[in-house]
Each structure stands twice: as structure tokens, then as C-alpha cells.
Regions:
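Helix-loop-beta substructure at the N-terminus of cytosolic sensory domains
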Residues: 1-9, 13-57, 64-66, 74
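Short hydrophobic/aromatic beta-strand element in the GNAT-like acyltransferase core
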Residues: 41, 102, 115, 127
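Regulatory sensory and allosteric helical modules in signal-transduction proteins
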Residues: 55-56, 62-111
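Short hydrophobic beta-strand micro-motif common in sensory/regulatory domains
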Residues: 112-119
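Short beta-strand-to-loop transition segments that serve as allosteric relay/switch motifs
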Residues: 127-136, 141
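Allosteric cytosolic regulatory segments
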Residues: 143, 147-154
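Signal-transducing coiled-coil/dimerization helices and immediately adjacent hinge/linker segments
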Residues: 162-180
């Protein structure tokens, strides 16, 4: 799968109803990884308050790279999620934006990455992250695909949030005694 039509078809087949959000996000993350042959791992970082966490991942490299950023409090996935900007790292060995993180990521085999913000209503709630063990392999087409996946992640989270609101309202309504 290397074009937008194939990506959209794969994402449209993701079933949202009657599933846990984590399962849906894991499936979307796997689709992202397959859509971009140059990447070896993908993850979704969500940020609640100032606390980041990996909501889904496909490939241990992604989880390891995410954790390295969380330990430091900065890095491309966290900055994408906070600043609503795309961050592409062509080569961790020479990137100077996050020198401590980049050095440790390279030591763990991550040589390039892409982090795309997750838009949700009027905010950014995290990032879609992709990682590769080779430098300079993520191109503009990968950025385009990642932005599309990020939009689908936002839809899944929006649907889960709405379903949670509806369920809470049903519980609240059921708790009110009938006045008949």
C-alpha cells in the first residue's frame, strides 16, 4: 500500500463500533506502518495534561523511542504533540534539536523518524510517530500519508469520546427516578 487511495481503503475497513479504543488505535498504527515501506515501527503518543503515553504501537523500536522521549521530557513526538508541528529527523546521528535524545535513539537503532501532530477539535492531543533504522528514508510522500493517518486517529478518538459521553448520559438518565 503506497498511495492515498489504498490507505483510505484500509483505514475505512477499520471497525470502530464495539471495540476498545486501544485496539482501534493499534490497528490504525499497523496500517500506517504498512503504508510506508521505509519505516520499521510506528506509534501513537497521546498527551493528557503534561503526561505523554504510548496509546498504541507496531514494532518495539517505536515503543523504545517513545519511552526515551518521555524519560527526557522532550523529543520529536512530544514536540509534535505540544506544538502542533511536523518533525522530521533525517539522521539522528547529526540532528541537533534534541541532542541527548537523538544520541540515545541512534544507539537503540533509530536513525530517522517522523512525528505528525494529532488534531482534535481545537487542540493537538499527541502525535503519530514513525521510526526507521536507516537515515534519510522518510520522504514527502510518507509525510502526506502520515498526515492522513493522523486525521483518522483523530476521528477514532472523537468517536470514542462521543460514545463515552453518550454512555455516561445513559447511566445518568437511568439513575434519575421516573416521575410518573
Amino acid at each position: 500500500m503506497q498511495n492515498l487511495t489504498e490507505l483510505h481503503e484500509a483505514l475505512a475497513r477499520v471497525v470502530l463500533a464495539d471495540r476498545q479504543l486501544g485496539d482501534v488505535l493499534t490497528e490504525i498504527t499497523a496500517i500506517a506502518r504498512r503504508a510506508m515501506p521505509s519505516i520499521e515501527a510506528a506509534s501513537i503518543t497521546l498527551i493528557r495534561g503534561e503526561k505523554p503515553f504510548t496509546a498504541a504501537y507496531d514494532g518495539q523500536m517505536a515503543l523504545d523511542a517513545d519511552e526515551l522521549q518521555y524519560e527526557r521530557g522532550y523529543g520529536p513526538c512530544m514536540d509534535a504533540g505540544r506544538a502542533a508541528q511536523v518533525f522530521l529527523v533525517d539522521d539522528m546521528r547529526s540532528d541537533q534539536r534534541w541532542p541527548d535524545y537523538a544520541q540515545h535513539a541512534a544507539a537503540h537503532g533509530v536513525l530517522s523518524s517522523l512525528s505528525v501532530p494529532l488534531p482534535f477539535q481545537d487542540a493537538t492531543i499527541g502525535a503519530l510517530n514513525t521510526y526507521a533504522g536507516r537515515p534519510r528514508v522518510i520522504d514527502d510522500h510518507d509525510v502526506e500519508l502520515a498526515n492522513e493517518v493522523a486525521a483518522w486517529v483523530a476521528i477514532a478518538i472523537g468517536n470514542a469520546t462521543k460514545l463515552g459521553d453518550v454512555a455516561a448520559e445513559l447511566v445518568r438518565t437511568a439513575a434519575v427516578p421516573s416521575r410518573g
